[in-house]
Amino acid sequence: VFQHTNIKPDIGIRVDYKAACPANLTVSDIDLCALIGNLIDNAVEACEGLADPYIRLYIGVLKNQLYISVTNATKDTVRKLDSEYITTKRGNHGHGLKRINLVVEKYEGYINRQNEPGVFVTEIMLPL
C-alpha cells in the first residue's frame, strides 16, 4: 500500500504502522487498497508543511470486524457540512473522501472521523 501513496522518504513524515489483515475478507483487494490508499494520501496532504509530521496506521481485527485506524498530524481544523467532513482542496472535489465513504457504505461498515487541534483520526470497521 505504501508504495502506491504519496509517502516519500525525503519529505520527513514519521510513519508508524501495525497491520495484521486476516486472510479471508469480505472486502475486495481493490476496494481495500483504494480505501487505505486514500486514507494515507489524505494524511500525507494534511502533514505537508508541519514541523513534526506523523502518520499512524493500524489494521487488525476488533470485535470480529476489520478495524482500520489512521491518525495524523494536521495544522487545520477540517471543515464540516451537515456533520460530514469536506475537502480542503481547491475546487472542493474531495474524490478521496467520497471513495472512502463509498467503500464503507458498500460493505455496510462504520466510519468515524475526529478532528482536534493538531490531530485528525479516521476509524473504519468493516464486516469480516
For each of these PLM feature ranges, what is it?
Residues V1-I11:
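Short beta-to-alpha transition helix within the HATPase_c
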Residues D16-L35:
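Conserved short strand/loop->alpha-helix "switch" segment adjacent to the catalytic nucleotide/phosphoryl-transfer site
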Residues D29-A51:
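Conserved ATP-binding N-box helix of the HATPase_c
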Residues L50, Y54-N64:
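Short beta-strand/loop element within the Bergerat-fold HATPase_c
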Residues N64-G94:
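Glycine-rich/acidic phosphate-handling loop/turn and adjacent ATP-lid/helix
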Residues D76, E116-E123:
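Glycine-rich nucleotide-binding loop
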Residues E108-G118:
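Glycine-rich ATP-binding loops of the HATPase_c
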